[in-house]
Amino acid sequence: MNSIRKGAFPLFRFAGIAVSLHWSWFLVAAYEISIERSAYTSIGWPIAEYLALFLIVLLHEFGHALACRQTGGTADYIVLWPLGGVAYVDPPQRPGAMLWSLAAGPLVNVALLPVLYIAVAFGRSAGLASTMPNLFHLLLAVQWINLILLGFNLLPIYPLDGGQILRSLLWFGIGRARSLMVAVVVGFVGVAAMIGWALLAQSTWIGIFAAFILLNCWSGLRYAQILLKMAKLPRRPGFACPSCQTAPPLGPYWRCGTCGARFDAFETGSSNYGRSAVAICPNCHANFPATRCLDCGRWYSIAEWAAAGAITVSAKPVDRATPVLPSA
């Protein structure tokens, strides 16, 4: 996803969320507009149709971003590219928060369904099909675009919204790691079906999208394997991540960013130094005001970890500094 972000240029900022457009969007836009040109009497109408697609995708991604913020997560960037949109969101690693952040995008499309249906029905009753055929065709096209985007996004194929919603629902019952593994396996099945569809339809675009999903499924599989290994680690009592409520693993799973030594951030931060609010490297004695949760990736001080674990720590608030890095 970072490669997508690198090739994008900024458009505008709304509600603290920066929106960017990938350069390849224009190439695909030109191609799609040329194809739709024959359905209209002037070039302006297919351009309007493609811009409507742009707007629907953008609203969908804003649904994800704003819902993520409601859960206490962070969301500050959206990029649009030929295969849709990507909202860079970081909700709390809890199934409920993840589910709402994911479902909010398709819910935007659901909200648009009656609006577009009424617009098409009004156009039909007003006789736009004969008096203003270009406008009526545009309304029909936008209605179908929204419906197709909704249906496609809800396919239970990871990392589409449907696949990630499936994972979030499974999370309630079988946990974070196993739910991801199941969603990824279902995703691989979906990729196989998409590849078959691409071959039968001789569609380059379906093949490209299948390749994109395959790469994400492979990445998800590797991450699920890491989560499964982490789930078996012994955990330190008395501390919990304020975001995902998971206790930190017991052992030297953090690496000092100064000397490179591996150490237990909670052992040195809680025992050797009288429950200080910072992690301290026992080798070079470097202080790290923020310690990363190896389960959800969020950064918190030892005091915040302790407070979430129902331990009272007497410490002043600390600024975030260069944190320790988790080992591979």
What are these regions (language model features)?
Residues 1-328:
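Hydrophobic transmembrane alpha-helices and their immediate loop junctions
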